[in-house]
């Protein structure tokens, strides 16, 4: 699991929640500009991403991650933010986020969402060899574009 948040206390909280659930293969960073390098070297099964960070926000990270994820792959990205407006949620989802949680976090809800995303990732990895890449790419092409609601 890769966690990116510019606030160290938020990273510490997420790491503690994950550790309590036995999830120890975690890499965290307060530097959103390093996300792609970490993603390429770590190959996470889940990315947990804060949206609003200085200099390089989570939306820019989402755009870059989307370009790196192959058509025959599925990487769940869980977005965390204090800005839970409809426009923010829709923009994040349109850019590839798979789920969205508002801050302050509820520990139980957060862990249930994380387990659901990890389960989906595991199922996808088990099935991706059965589905041609072209079919997945067609699904991605029909995804609505991000824009004003």
Q: Where are the predicted features?
A:
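The feature encodes the CheY-like receiver
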Residues: 54-57, 81, 85, 103
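C-terminal output helix
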Residues: 104-114, 118, 122
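Acidic catalytic/metal-coordinating carboxylates
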Residues: 30-31, 57-63, 135
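Acidic, metal-coordinating helix/loop segments flanking the phosphotransfer/catalytic sites
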Residues: 28-46
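Two-component/phosphorelay signaling modules centered on CheY-like receiver
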Residues: 8-27
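Alpha4 helix (beta4-alpha4-beta5 surface) of REC/receiver domains from two-component response regulators
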Residues: 15-16, 41, 60, 73, ...
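Short amphipathic alpha-helix used as the core "switch/output" element in two-component signaling
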Residues: 37, 59-72
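Active-site residues of response regulator receiver
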Residues: 5, 50, 81
């Amino acid at each position: 699991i890769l966690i990116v948040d510019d606030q160290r206390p938020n990273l510490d909280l997420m790491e503690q929640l994950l550790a309590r659930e036995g999830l120890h293969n975690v890499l965290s960073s307060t530097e959103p500009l390093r996300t792609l390098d970490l993603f390429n070297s770590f190959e996470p099964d889940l990315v947990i991403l804060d949206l609003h960070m200085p200099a390089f926000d989570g939306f820019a990270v989402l755009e870059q991650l989307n370009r790196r994820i192959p058509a025959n792959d599925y990487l769940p990205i869980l977005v965390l933010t204090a800005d839970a407006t409809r426009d923010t949620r829709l923009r994040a989802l349109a850019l590839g986020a798979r789920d969205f949680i508002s801050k302050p976090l509820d520990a139980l809800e957060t862990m249930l969402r994380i387990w659901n995303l990890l389960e989906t990732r595991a199922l996808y990895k088990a099935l991706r060899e059965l589905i041609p890449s072209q079919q997945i790419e067609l699904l991605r092409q029909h995804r609505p574009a991000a824009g004003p609601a």
